[in-house]
Amino acid sequence: MKTPLKHYTEFLNENIYKNIKYLNSAEDYLGRFYGEFMSYSGGDGQSLGIVLTPKHITELFCELVELKSTDSVLDPCCGTAGFLIAAMHDMLQKTDNFEEQRKIKKNQLHGLELQPYMFTISTTNMILRGDGKSNLEQEDFLKYNPSLLQEKGCTMGMMNPPYSMGSRNNTSLY
């Protein structure tokens, strides 16, 4: 007899993890889940500046900047990693070379995220796609050392910066 935890774990593995891991998609499933979860929690996250970028917008960014498989991408406010997922998907589609694909995942995607819970989601998102969160950092972009950013050698930047519509009484949000 299966325990509830065992049943739930098997369900997640069969119906979610396997679909995300092997699906060739730029969809930010964890971001969508987070957004849906926030809608049931009594808030939408917007008061904290949390507005997730839709997939069609992240894909449009990749098209507009004419992303190449050799580019290195930085999202300084990566949230759930939607832009990095779209960039990775786009760049992987542009090469059949296994070594280049490995390099894209390991070296060419960089993200910074200040919020710990969003950093956890972005890290999980990238691990599920075989990236291993190699270049994600829980850091404040505005306080990040510019010379360290230059060392990353990024050729493209993509971002949807957080903004707040909350109370001006909470100056930490501005």
Kindly give the residue locations of the regions a language model identified.
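Conserved S-adenosyl-L-methionine
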Residues: 47-156, 164-168
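Long recognition/docking surfaces used for binding and targeting
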Residues: 1-41
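Long, N-terminal intrinsically disordered regulatory "head" regions
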Residues: 169-174
